[in-house]
Amino acid sequence: MRCSQREVFVKREEPTNPEWGKPPSQRTADEYIRHSFVILDKPRGPSSHEVAAWVKKILGVERAGHAGTLDPKVSGVLPIAVAEGTKVLMALSRSDKVYVAVAKFHGDVDEERLRAVLREFQGEIYQKPPLRSAVKRQLRTRRVFSLELLELEGRYAVIKMHVEAGTYARKIIHDIGEVLGVGANMRELRRVAVTCFTEDEAVTLQDVADAYYIWKKYGDDTYLRSVLLPIEEIARHLPKIWVRDSAVDAVCHGAPLAAPGISKFEVPFSKGDIVAMFTLKGELVGIGRALVDSEEVKKMERGAVVRTDRVVMRRGTYPAMWKKGQRAAKT
C-alpha cells in the first residue's frame, strides 16, 4: 500500500520563529531516539510484547509500545514506538493491514471456484473472534478490501489479504474452506504492511542493536537515523494540520485546536477522522479527532477544529500565548 497524496490548503501564510523548537532532522541522537519509532520485521517465535521489550532494552529507554499485535507464530511488520513516541500510537489504531497467508485445504479445490469464493468475501463480512482471543467473542463486521490468490499448488494456497484493523485472517481462511465445502486451516501468516508502512522498510532487531552500538562506540548516528524513523513519520497516512507558533503551546496543554491557530492543512478529511497536528518546522505536536470536515475549516474564522487527544511535544517548547483554563489532554 502507498499513502495517498493530499493537497494542501493554505489558510494563512505564517513564518516560524527559529528560536523555538527545531526541525526533526536537527535533533540530537538522544532526542531523536526519544522521539522515534521503528518498523520492525518481527520474527516467528516471540510475542509482540517481548519484541517491544527487547527494543526498549537495546535503546536504553523507559518504555516502548507496539501497534497491532502479532501472535508469536506470525512474522512481519510490527510498528514499535519509543519513549515519547508511545503517546501517539493511537495514530495507527484503526490502520488497515495486509497479510500473506498459506492455507491448506482438506480436499481438492478448483482454482476458478476458489477465485470466485475469494471475490465473495470482499466487502463487509461478519466475524466472531476465535476461542483463543484477547477480546470478547461477539459477532462484528469487518471490511475486506481485497483477497488475491497468489499461488495454488495441490491443496495449498498462498492468499494475500488487505483487511480492516481487527480482522482475523485465520477465521477468513476457515470460512473460505467452509464455503468451498472442504474445510481449511491456516498454516502460516506474515503481515506485509500496516497502512503504508511495508515490509520493504522493515528492519530486524539485529539492525536496531547494531545501529545503537555503532553510535555509542564510534559516535556515528547515521545508521541509527536510518533504522529509527522520526516520530513524525507515524502520521504519514493521516491528514496533517500545521499550527501557528502562537497556538502550539495551547495544544501542548491539551486545548482544542481552534481555527485562528491554523496556518495550513491537507484536504480532504471528514468530521471524526484522526488528524495530526504539526508545527511549521515539521515537528509533531499531537493527534486528535476532527470536529468538522476540511471544507468547513476553509471558511472558519473561529471555533474548535480538532479535539486534542494525545500530545507528544513537551510543554514550553513554544512560548505560551493563550489563556489558561481549558481541559488538558493525556500526555
From Swiss-Prot:
Its EC number(s)? 5.4.99.25
Which Pfam family, just one, is annotated for this protein? PUA
Catalytic activities: uridine(55) in tRNA = pseudouridine(55) in tRNA
Region (Disordered), start-end ranges = 1-27
- One biological process GO term for this chain? snRNA pseudouridine synthesis
Gene3D superfamilies under this entry? Answer: Pseudouridine synthase, PUA domain
What sort of enzyme, by top EC class, is this? Answer: isomerase
The record's GO molecular-function terms, alphabetically, read: RNA binding; tRNA pseudouridine(55) synthase activity
What keywords would UniProt list here? Isomerase, tRNA processing
Report biased composition (Basic and acidic residues) as residue ranges: 1-15
Which residues are named in the active-site annotation?
71
Which InterPro entries does the protein's record reference? Dyskerin-like (IPR012960), PsdUridine_synth_cat_dom_sf (IPR020103), PsdUridine_synth_N (IPR002501), PUA (IPR002478), PUA-like_sf (IPR015947), PUA_sf (IPR036974), tRNA_PsdUridine_synth_B_fam (IPR004802), TruB_arch (IPR026326)
* Domain PUA: start-end pairs: 238-313
Function of the protein: Could be responsible for synthesis of pseudouridine from uracil-55 in the psi GC loop of transfer RNAs.
State the family it belongs to. Answer: Belongs to the pseudouridine synthase TruB family. Type 2 subfamily.
Name of the protein described by the UniProt record: Probable tRNA pseudouridine synthase B
> Which organism was this protein described from?
Pyrobaculum arsenaticum (strain DSM 13514 / JCM 11321 / PZ6)
Q: Which gene encodes it?
A: truB
